[in-house]
Amino acid sequence: MMNTKKLMKMAKKWQQRAALRRKRISFQRSNSTTSSSSAVEKGCFVVYTADQVRFAFPISYLSNSVIQELLKISEEEFGIPTEGPITLPFDSIRFSWSISSN
C-alpha cells in the first residue's frame, strides 16, 4: 500500500502533466485559411474566429474602426486573454463579410 504523501505527490505530477497537454492542444489551429504557418510576419497581428480559422493582418489595421469594434466585442464576450490567441465571437464567414464590407 502507498503512503499518503507519495500518492499526493503522484496525483500532483499527473495534474501538472494534464495541464501542460491542455495548453498545448489549445494553441494548435489546423483550419487556417489565411495563413498556413504558426509564425506571424513582423508587423502583423493574428485573431481567430469561433470556428478556429486564423486571420493575420498588418498592425496598421488596428486603427480601422471596424477592427476596433470587433476587438471590443471580443473583449466583452471573452475578456482580455493573458495567454493564447485573441478569439472573435463569430465564425469565419461572418468575420470575412465584416471586414470585406468596410
Swiss-Prot record:
Protein's UniProt keywords contain Ion transport: no
InterPro entries, per database record: SAUR_fam
Record has Cell membrane as a keyword: yes
Ranges in coiled-coil conformation: none
Origin: domain of life: Eukaryota
Localisation per UniProt entry: Cell membrane
Record-level GO cellular component terms: plasma membrane
GO BP: any one term: auxin-activated signaling pathway
Entry function: May promote auxin-stimulated organ elongation, such as hypocotyls, stamen filaments and petals.
Record PANTHER family: AUXIN-RESPONSIVE FAMILY PROTEIN, AUXIN-RESPONSIVE PROTEIN SAUR61-RELATED
Name under which the protein is recorded: Auxin-responsive protein SAUR68
Organism: Arabidopsis thaliana
